[in-house]
């Protein structure tokens, strides 16, 4: 997921869009860890300084959107945030949109967002924004198998951020979408490694 994140962030920058940040999965995990274990010391915690910088960038308008691919655990039709004892078995997409004061949530199984995710994002946003954010559905292709969630989640995010380049994929085109994603990542890695070689 992080290689696709890098390639998509690069596509955004190439399109002149600098106001969108796509979080690394480890950055999202750090926000979750702070919420679970250090919520009272978030504003002082040294290891949280880069997380606070992202929040400050939301506050001052540097970023208008922050997107993340989130690993969740589905059990008996309910969704929970993953942790070290219950690793994720499904990927969803979250986009914080300051311009519309909304949190867009895309799940290819159409399950509601985990309560802990809702609470965590409210907690984090409360440190950096004053308005109330409303939850809304993020358009996503519905999943009919047990293994396409990463590609569907990734394309849902890409479609929301760069719709002309990334249309939502029809369910029957998941294999082609995987190939297209691989080509995008290889192209990105080839270009960035050749730039570094000059």
Language model segments and positions:
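Cysteine protease catalytic domains with a Cys-His-Asp triad
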Residues: 1-92, 96-102
